[in-house]
């Protein structure tokens, strides 16, 4: 599972953490990286892979200006950005949003048309399960029904959508299983859904007001998978990892070239495997508030300095730190 900065929304900040390795916990409270801070070129996974000859493409079947993506994506290293205008207007939709299956059909079409042997980094943000979940769709069959009065229609609707996502994901994995070109797929959730408190209390078995910090953090965790159609160094020690480490973990497990910043993040993860705006978890599994002064404070402060250089110090961004030329 990966730990995110918030629950119920804010997809772009999850994108930012994965793509840059930076943490939203270092931004002002309720800050948004895409709309407030990415005003110039910022190093990212896209820019690193671009240095190594990859074409870089972002794809999100929604309006291009959502979360300022049409401005941000070029600044963080993407050559091109496909939005909802690239989709078949008559394509499958649930609740007005393009289905995951329709989204993945577009990805398959892109891969079928790309130049053979030319490496491609494609960053896709799906839209099917976008909130809210109050209104039913007569064209969508809700197959999940939890037999408990606290399991509301919205919860059942959301879980039915996730079930549909599972089916679509299986299909695209099967597609890449049959491709000769080495391919890596990283899939992770952007945030937990915004559902009624009564449903979450059903899951916890207690009032949300009585949750410990450790229990609260469960509302900020989502599943992830790193898969490849060839043998990779699969790890079993990734039960708890925050999104800012996820791209570095992917580079490590697949033996792709890393920057010194990636190496710093992987070393930091050994001490602080997960952190977000609520706090962090140390190597022994103990939860801490960000305001605590302890043996991890110096490391977290160093991390904040490096993030400042990446995001804020546009005239002095360290090419040695964020470039792959000096990495492994």
Which ranges hold each PLM region?
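Solvent-exposed soluble domains appended to multi-pass membrane proteins
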Residues: 1-328
